[in-house]
């Protein structure tokens, strides 16, 4: 029988999931996205060539891998078509490899307008969204008024769209004092999207299940990271979807008993983009060093990432939330040359803080407790054998395993798929 592997972020996103998914899809027949939208940014480097994907699963570069976009994804047809064209211009036959659930809610122009108007109105209290309409699209889904991909092919689309635009325009013009969304322009877009995407629509749940029954290896690719989960993250500084392993089942229709291994991707330090609490954040030369050496700029937004020491307490929480089978530690090479390396091993919690919450307010009030380990002078760049790592690097990895009670199964030592140490392959575990 085949194995079903979940790959997801276990920090605040940007952990390097794209490279690892691309690496592991060598053994997979299909890759499925299960949540998020084009606010994700997955960077792949293959033979020195860089590709950035936002919606399409990272397995698209593999000749024999089918890629699925599950119902848990909010789909921007406009962004998808742009991404498809970029890949097709590079001779990637996207239409032969990509299938999309008809139950994906669509991101419409009014969602983007609402997202941007809200962030502007919040001023200094902004959440730090990408402004791409993700949150408002999920709101329409939960409120049971979303236009889904399937609706593009139904006769009542015009009436449904007209009512929705009227509903959202009232808020846009009367409360936010911005321009209304034009119905005719939006309806014409919907007709264009219908024609462009018709051949890609597929019952994703049934297709994945048939592959499973045939004994094929499947992969489920997460976007963002555990600490951005709508339920378990640093609320309200979170995304609008279920980022944890539980989101796989709701976002694809493949039940939890069919998931065999959950891999948590985590950097050897910690980063965060945008607003929100970050207990181990660094504001000194070391933080600047990590940002510079790690090229810490978001693949989607281009925003500089905030950098800090590894937070083992937050990761221990992610291990529990996702029932992680193993960890992939990325960007170990960024720590090369540091005299000492600190690990956040726990928190001092104010007596007044409601410690059970583990939300944004909780993380804002805690003070991290640190443990200091010696750094290493040798380079880890491109190392593919664990025994070749500096002894101090091995000690750092072992200490992380002890603190989070989860094995480090994969270590990434550079951006290329070949710059990797695989201690335990998820498909062989």
From Swiss-Prot:
Signal sequence segment: none
One example GO MF annotation: GTP binding
Principal location: cytoplasm
UniProt binding sites for Mg(2+): 14, 41
Binding site for GTP: 13-19, 41-43, 305, 331-333, 412-414
Keywords: Cytoplasm, GTP-binding, Ligase, Magnesium, Metal-binding, Nucleotide-binding, Purine biosynthesis
Catalytic reactions of this protein: IMP + L-aspartate + GTP = N(6)-(1,2-dicarboxyethyl)-AMP + GDP + phosphate + 2 H(+)
Cofactor note: Binds 1 Mg(2+) ion per subunit.
Cofactor dependency: Mg(2+)
Pathway stated in the Swiss-Prot or TrEMBL entry: Purine metabolism; AMP biosynthesis via de novo pathway; AMP from IMP: step 1/2
GO cellular component assignments: cytoplasm
Family as reported in the entry's similarity comment: Belongs to the adenylosuccinate synthetase family.
Subunit structure: Homodimer.
Role according to the record: Plays an important role in the de novo pathway of purine nucleotide biosynthesis. Catalyzes the first committed step in the biosynthesis of AMP from IMP.
Official protein name in the record: Adenylosuccinate synthetase
Protein source organism: Psychrobacter sp. (strain PRwf-1)
